[in-house]
UniProtKB/Swiss-Prot annotation:
Family named by the database record: Belongs to the universal ribosomal protein uS2 family.
Entry GO CC: cytosolic small ribosomal subunit
Primary gene name: rpsB
GO biological process, one term: translation
Organism lineage: Bacteria, Pseudomonadati, Pseudomonadota, Alphaproteobacteria, Hyphomicrobiales
Protein name listed in UniProt: Small ribosomal subunit protein uS2
One Pfam family hit: Ribosomal_S2
Keyword presence, Ligase: no
InterPro entries: Ribosomal_uS2 (IPR001865), Ribosomal_uS2_bac/mit/plastid (IPR005706), Ribosomal_uS2_CS (IPR018130), Ribosomal_uS2_flav_dom_sf (IPR023591)
GO molecular function annotation: structural constituent of ribosome
Gene3D superfamilies on file: Glucose-6-phosphate isomerase like protein, domain 1, Helix hairpin bin
PANTHER family: 30S RIBOSOMAL PROTEIN S2 PROKARYOTIC AND ORGANELLAR (PTHR12534), SMALL RIBOSOMAL SUBUNIT PROTEIN US2M (PTHR12534:SF0)
Amino acid sequence: MSLPEFSMRQLLEAGVHFGHQSHRWNPKMADYIFGVRNNIHIVDLTQTVPLLHRALQAISDTVAKGGRVLFVGTKRQAQDAVADAAKRSAQYFVNSRWLGGTLTNWKTISGSIRRLRHLEDVLSSADANAYTKKERLELQRERDKLNRSLGGIKDMGGLPDLIFVIDTNKEDIAIQEAQRLGIPVAAIVDTNCDPKGITYLVPGNDDAGRAIALYCDLVARAVIDGISRAQGDVGIDIGAAAQPLREDLPAAQATTFQGLPGPRGTPDDLKKLPGVSGAIEKKFNDLGIFHFWQLAELDQATAHQIGEELGLPSRADAWVAQAKSLTAEAE
Protein backbone atom coordinates (compact mmCIF):
# COMPACT_ATOMS: atom_id res chain seq x y z
CA MET A 1 0.00 0.00 0.00
CA SER A 2 0.99 3.63 -0.44
CA LEU A 3 -0.50 7.03 0.26
CA PRO A 4 -3.45 7.65 -2.12
CA GLU A 5 -2.62 9.70 -5.19
CA PHE A 6 -4.84 12.41 -6.64
CA SER A 7 -4.53 15.11 -9.28
CA MET A 8 -5.59 18.72 -9.61
CA ARG A 9 -7.87 17.58 -12.44
CA GLN A 10 -9.74 15.32 -10.01
CA LEU A 11 -10.19 18.23 -7.63
CA LEU A 12 -11.48 20.44 -10.46
CA GLU A 13 -13.93 17.79 -11.68
CA ALA A 14 -15.26 17.38 -8.13
CA GLY A 15 -15.77 21.14 -7.77
CA VAL A 16 -13.29 21.53 -4.92
CA HIS A 17 -12.30 24.98 -6.23
CA PHE A 18 -15.76 26.54 -5.85
CA GLY A 19 -16.05 28.57 -2.66
CA HIS A 20 -18.99 30.60 -1.38
CA GLN A 21 -20.42 33.89 -2.61
CA SER A 22 -17.83 36.61 -2.20
CA HIS A 23 -19.94 38.60 0.27
CA ARG A 24 -20.07 35.57 2.62
CA TRP A 25 -16.33 35.09 2.86
CA ASN A 26 -14.16 34.98 5.95
CA PRO A 27 -11.22 37.39 5.47
CA LYS A 28 -8.94 34.94 7.30
CA MET A 29 -9.19 32.69 4.22
CA ALA A 30 -7.86 35.41 1.89
CA ASP A 31 -4.49 33.68 1.48
CA TYR A 32 -6.18 30.58 0.06
CA ILE A 33 -8.43 32.36 -2.48
CA PHE A 34 -7.35 32.56 -6.13
CA GLY A 35 -9.93 35.12 -7.22
CA VAL A 36 -13.62 35.82 -7.86
CA ARG A 37 -15.73 34.52 -10.74
CA ASN A 38 -19.43 35.38 -11.12
CA ASN A 39 -19.44 36.64 -7.54
CA ILE A 40 -18.10 33.26 -6.30
CA HIS A 41 -14.73 32.91 -4.61
CA ILE A 42 -12.38 30.45 -6.31
CA VAL A 43 -10.10 28.41 -4.06
CA ASP A 44 -6.41 28.32 -4.99
CA LEU A 45 -5.92 24.63 -5.79
CA THR A 46 -2.15 25.06 -6.09
CA GLN A 47 -2.28 25.36 -2.30
CA THR A 48 -5.01 22.76 -1.77
CA VAL A 49 -2.99 19.98 -3.44
CA PRO A 50 0.06 20.08 -1.11
CA LEU A 51 -2.06 20.78 1.97
CA LEU A 52 -4.35 17.83 1.22
CA HIS A 53 -1.31 15.60 0.71
CA ARG A 54 0.08 16.81 4.06
CA ALA A 55 -3.21 15.99 5.81
CA LEU A 56 -3.36 12.51 4.26
CA GLN A 57 0.22 11.85 5.35
CA ALA A 58 -0.61 12.90 8.92
CA ILE A 59 -3.66 10.62 8.95
CA SER A 60 -1.67 7.66 7.64
CA ASP A 61 1.12 8.28 10.16
CA THR A 62 -1.39 8.49 13.02
CA VAL A 63 -2.92 5.12 12.14
CA ALA A 64 0.48 3.52 11.49
CA LYS A 65 1.36 4.32 15.11
CA GLY A 66 -1.79 2.57 16.33
CA GLY A 67 -3.95 5.70 16.52
CA ARG A 68 -7.68 6.07 15.91
CA VAL A 69 -9.29 8.49 13.46
CA LEU A 70 -12.75 9.96 14.01
CA PHE A 71 -14.65 11.16 10.91
CA VAL A 72 -17.05 14.03 11.67
CA GLY A 73 -19.65 15.24 9.17
CA THR A 74 -23.22 15.84 10.29
CA LYS A 75 -24.51 17.89 7.34
CA ARG A 76 -26.86 16.05 5.01
CA GLN A 77 -24.43 15.92 2.06
CA ALA A 78 -21.69 14.38 4.22
CA GLN A 79 -23.56 11.84 6.33
CA ASP A 80 -23.41 8.82 4.02
CA ALA A 81 -19.90 9.51 2.70
CA VAL A 82 -18.49 9.91 6.22
CA ALA A 83 -20.11 6.70 7.50
CA ASP A 84 -19.09 4.65 4.45
CA ALA A 85 -15.47 5.86 4.55
CA ALA A 86 -15.13 5.21 8.29
CA LYS A 87 -16.59 1.70 8.01
CA ARG A 88 -14.45 0.86 4.98
CA SER A 89 -11.29 1.84 6.84
CA ALA A 90 -12.30 0.31 10.21
CA GLN A 91 -12.45 3.71 11.91
CA TYR A 92 -15.15 5.70 13.70
CA PHE A 93 -17.62 8.43 12.80
CA VAL A 94 -20.23 10.91 13.94
CA ASN A 95 -22.73 11.76 11.19
CA SER A 96 -25.73 12.74 13.27
CA ARG A 97 -25.96 15.61 15.74
CA TRP A 98 -22.72 16.11 17.69
CA LEU A 99 -23.43 15.59 21.38
CA GLY A 100 -21.73 18.23 23.49
CA GLY A 101 -19.03 16.56 25.59
CA THR A 102 -18.48 13.67 23.19
CA LEU A 103 -14.74 14.20 23.66
CA THR A 104 -14.44 16.36 26.77
CA ASN A 105 -16.89 14.28 28.81
CA TRP A 106 -15.98 10.84 27.51
CA LYS A 107 -16.83 9.17 30.84
CA THR A 108 -20.50 10.10 30.48
CA ILE A 109 -20.53 9.18 26.79
CA SER A 110 -19.04 5.78 27.71
CA GLY A 111 -21.97 5.21 30.04
CA SER A 112 -24.40 5.87 27.19
CA ILE A 113 -22.43 3.49 24.96
CA ARG A 114 -22.69 0.78 27.63
CA ARG A 115 -26.45 1.37 27.72
CA LEU A 116 -26.59 1.03 23.92
CA ARG A 117 -24.66 -2.25 24.04
CA HIS A 118 -26.95 -3.56 26.77
CA LEU A 119 -30.04 -2.73 24.72
CA GLU A 120 -28.56 -4.41 21.64
CA ASP A 121 -27.77 -7.55 23.62
CA VAL A 122 -31.21 -7.67 25.24
CA LEU A 123 -33.14 -7.10 22.01
CA SER A 124 -31.11 -9.68 20.08
CA SER A 125 -31.43 -12.40 22.72
CA ALA A 126 -34.23 -14.59 23.98
CA ASP A 127 -34.57 -12.23 26.96
CA ALA A 128 -36.52 -9.85 24.70
CA ASN A 129 -39.50 -12.22 24.93
CA ALA A 130 -39.75 -11.43 28.64
CA TYR A 131 -40.92 -7.90 27.78
CA THR A 132 -44.34 -6.86 26.57
CA LYS A 133 -44.75 -5.60 23.02
CA LYS A 134 -45.00 -2.02 24.30
CA GLU A 135 -41.86 -2.39 26.43
CA ARG A 136 -39.91 -3.85 23.51
CA LEU A 137 -41.00 -0.96 21.31
CA GLU A 138 -39.79 1.54 23.92
CA LEU A 139 -36.44 -0.28 24.18
CA GLN A 140 -36.10 -0.31 20.39
CA ARG A 141 -36.78 3.43 20.21
CA GLU A 142 -34.19 4.10 22.91
CA ARG A 143 -31.67 1.87 21.11
CA ASP A 144 -32.30 3.58 17.76
CA LYS A 145 -31.93 7.04 19.29
CA LEU A 146 -28.64 6.11 20.97
CA ASN A 147 -27.42 4.37 17.83
CA ARG A 148 -27.99 7.48 15.70
CA SER A 149 -25.76 9.52 17.98
CA LEU A 150 -23.28 6.92 19.21
CA GLY A 151 -23.39 4.01 16.76
CA GLY A 152 -20.32 5.24 14.91
CA ILE A 153 -18.18 5.53 18.06
CA LYS A 154 -19.49 2.67 20.22
CA ASP A 155 -16.42 0.55 19.40
CA MET A 156 -13.88 3.37 19.67
CA GLY A 157 -12.83 2.40 23.20
CA GLY A 158 -11.38 5.81 24.06
CA LEU A 159 -10.58 9.23 22.66
CA PRO A 160 -9.48 9.46 19.02
CA ASP A 161 -5.93 10.44 18.10
CA LEU A 162 -7.06 12.67 15.21
CA ILE A 163 -10.39 13.93 13.91
CA PHE A 164 -11.23 14.59 10.26
CA VAL A 165 -13.94 17.23 9.78
CA ILE A 166 -16.19 18.29 6.91
CA ASP A 167 -17.43 21.91 7.42
CA THR A 168 -15.67 23.61 10.32
CA ASN A 169 -18.52 26.09 10.83
CA LYS A 170 -21.10 23.38 11.46
CA GLU A 171 -18.74 21.20 13.52
CA ASP A 172 -17.29 24.05 15.61
CA ILE A 173 -18.16 22.36 18.93
CA ALA A 174 -16.34 19.16 17.93
CA ILE A 175 -13.30 21.21 16.90
CA GLN A 176 -13.31 23.20 20.16
CA GLU A 177 -13.44 19.98 22.19
CA ALA A 178 -10.56 18.49 20.20
CA GLN A 179 -8.50 21.66 20.67
CA ARG A 180 -9.10 21.62 24.43
CA LEU A 181 -7.78 18.07 24.59
CA GLY A 182 -4.88 18.64 22.20
CA ILE A 183 -6.30 16.28 19.57
CA PRO A 184 -5.09 17.21 16.04
CA VAL A 185 -7.78 18.31 13.59
CA ALA A 186 -7.65 17.73 9.83
CA ALA A 187 -10.46 19.65 8.17
CA ILE A 188 -11.90 20.84 4.89
CA VAL A 189 -12.10 24.63 5.25
CA ASP A 190 -14.31 26.59 2.84
CA THR A 191 -14.00 30.30 2.02
CA ASN A 192 -16.62 31.23 4.65
CA CYS A 193 -14.80 29.45 7.51
CA ASP A 194 -12.23 30.43 10.12
CA PRO A 195 -9.00 28.43 9.66
CA LYS A 196 -7.74 29.25 13.16
CA GLY A 197 -6.84 26.22 15.25
CA ILE A 198 -7.03 23.67 12.42
CA THR A 199 -3.90 21.51 12.57
CA TYR A 200 -4.10 20.22 9.00
CA LEU A 201 -6.09 22.73 6.98
CA VAL A 202 -7.34 21.79 3.50
CA PRO A 203 -8.96 24.73 1.66
CA GLY A 204 -11.85 23.56 -0.49
CA ASN A 205 -15.57 23.24 -1.14
CA ASP A 206 -17.33 21.64 1.83
CA ASP A 207 -20.83 21.52 0.29
CA ALA A 208 -20.64 19.66 -3.04
CA GLY A 209 -21.44 15.97 -2.76
CA ARG A 210 -18.75 14.94 -5.27
CA ALA A 211 -16.09 16.93 -3.43
CA ILE A 212 -17.07 15.44 -0.06
CA ALA A 213 -17.06 11.93 -1.53
CA LEU A 214 -13.55 12.53 -2.91
CA TYR A 215 -12.20 13.81 0.43
CA CYS A 216 -13.68 10.87 2.34
CA ASP A 217 -12.37 8.33 -0.15
CA LEU A 218 -8.85 9.75 0.02
CA VAL A 219 -8.88 9.82 3.83
CA ALA A 220 -10.19 6.23 4.01
CA ARG A 221 -7.40 5.09 1.69
CA ALA A 222 -4.83 6.99 3.78
CA VAL A 223 -6.09 5.16 6.88
CA ILE A 224 -5.83 1.80 5.11
CA ASP A 225 -2.28 2.72 4.10
CA GLY A 226 -1.51 3.39 7.77
CA ILE A 227 -2.99 0.04 8.80
CA SER A 228 -0.85 -1.74 6.19
CA ARG A 229 2.28 0.03 7.42
CA ALA A 230 1.48 -0.92 11.02
CA GLN A 231 1.06 -4.57 10.04
CA GLY A 232 4.34 -4.46 8.15
CA ASP A 233 6.08 -3.13 11.27
CA VAL A 234 4.97 -6.17 13.30
CA GLY A 235 6.21 -8.56 10.63
CA ILE A 236 2.99 -9.44 8.82
CA ASP A 237 3.57 -10.16 5.13
CA ILE A 238 0.92 -8.01 3.46
CA GLY A 239 1.92 -9.24 0.01
CA ALA A 240 1.52 -12.87 1.02
CA ALA A 241 -2.00 -12.17 2.26
CA ALA A 242 -2.92 -10.80 -1.16
CA GLN A 243 -1.48 -13.70 -3.17
CA PRO A 244 -3.95 -15.89 -5.08
CA LEU A 245 -4.69 -19.40 -3.93
CA ARG A 246 -2.57 -22.20 -5.39
CA GLU A 247 -4.04 -23.57 -8.59
CA ASP A 248 -4.13 -27.13 -7.29
CA LEU A 249 -6.42 -26.17 -4.39
CA PRO A 250 -10.04 -27.10 -5.14
CA ALA A 251 -12.29 -24.05 -5.37
CA ALA A 252 -14.79 -25.49 -2.91
CA GLN A 253 -12.08 -25.92 -0.29
CA ALA A 254 -11.05 -22.28 -0.62
CA THR A 255 -14.43 -20.99 0.56
CA THR A 256 -15.35 -23.72 3.06
CA PHE A 257 -14.90 -22.67 6.66
CA GLN A 258 -14.78 -25.20 9.47
CA GLY A 259 -15.45 -23.68 12.86
CA LEU A 260 -14.35 -25.11 16.19
CA PRO A 261 -16.76 -27.04 18.43
CA GLY A 262 -15.53 -24.87 21.31
CA PRO A 263 -12.72 -22.49 22.30
CA ARG A 264 -9.20 -23.85 22.65
CA GLY A 265 -8.39 -22.59 26.10
CA THR A 266 -9.47 -19.04 26.89
CA PRO A 267 -11.48 -17.48 24.03
CA ASP A 268 -10.28 -14.14 22.66
CA ASP A 269 -12.28 -10.96 23.22
CA LEU A 270 -13.70 -10.58 19.71
CA LYS A 271 -15.28 -7.27 20.73
CA LYS A 272 -11.83 -5.75 20.11
CA LEU A 273 -12.58 -6.08 16.40
CA PRO A 274 -14.17 -3.04 14.70
CA GLY A 275 -17.96 -3.04 14.81
CA VAL A 276 -18.26 -6.17 16.97
CA SER A 277 -20.72 -5.93 19.85
CA GLY A 278 -21.57 -8.60 22.37
CA ALA A 279 -24.37 -9.81 20.11
CA ILE A 280 -22.06 -10.08 17.10
CA GLU A 281 -19.45 -11.87 19.22
CA LYS A 282 -22.11 -14.46 20.11
CA LYS A 283 -22.85 -14.94 16.40
CA PHE A 284 -19.13 -15.48 15.79
CA ASN A 285 -19.16 -18.13 18.53
CA ASP A 286 -22.22 -19.77 16.97
CA LEU A 287 -20.18 -20.12 13.77
CA GLY A 288 -17.37 -21.76 15.74
CA ILE A 289 -15.12 -18.68 15.82
CA PHE A 290 -13.55 -18.01 19.22
CA HIS A 291 -10.02 -16.81 18.44
CA PHE A 292 -8.28 -14.05 16.46
CA TRP A 293 -6.06 -16.58 14.71
CA GLN A 294 -9.11 -18.18 13.10
CA LEU A 295 -10.00 -14.90 11.41
CA ALA A 296 -6.37 -14.12 10.57
CA GLU A 297 -6.18 -17.32 8.51
CA LEU A 298 -9.26 -16.58 6.40
CA ASP A 299 -8.98 -15.84 2.69
CA GLN A 300 -10.93 -12.85 1.36
CA ALA A 301 -13.82 -14.86 -0.11
CA THR A 302 -14.45 -16.79 3.13
CA ALA A 303 -14.12 -13.64 5.23
CA HIS A 304 -16.75 -11.90 3.12
CA GLN A 305 -18.99 -14.97 3.30
CA ILE A 306 -18.83 -14.83 7.10
CA GLY A 307 -19.41 -11.08 7.01
CA GLU A 308 -22.57 -11.66 4.96
CA GLU A 309 -23.81 -14.22 7.49
CA LEU A 310 -23.28 -11.73 10.32
CA GLY A 311 -24.90 -8.89 8.37
CA LEU A 312 -21.68 -6.82 8.27
CA PRO A 313 -19.99 -7.64 4.94
CA SER A 314 -18.23 -4.25 4.76
CA ARG A 315 -16.33 -5.05 7.98
CA ALA A 316 -14.85 -8.37 6.82
CA ASP A 317 -11.53 -7.05 5.49
CA ALA A 318 -11.03 -4.91 8.58
CA TRP A 319 -11.70 -7.90 10.87
CA VAL A 320 -9.05 -9.98 9.14
CA ALA A 321 -6.52 -7.13 9.18
CA GLN A 322 -7.12 -6.40 12.87
CA ALA A 323 -7.07 -10.11 13.76
CA LYS A 324 -3.69 -10.52 12.05
CA SER A 325 -2.33 -7.56 14.00
CA LEU A 326 -3.66 -8.85 17.34
CA THR A 327 -2.37 -12.36 16.63
CA ALA A 328 1.09 -10.98 15.84
CA GLU A 329 1.09 -8.94 19.08
CA ALA A 330 0.18 -12.04 21.11
CA GLU A 331 3.11 -13.94 19.62
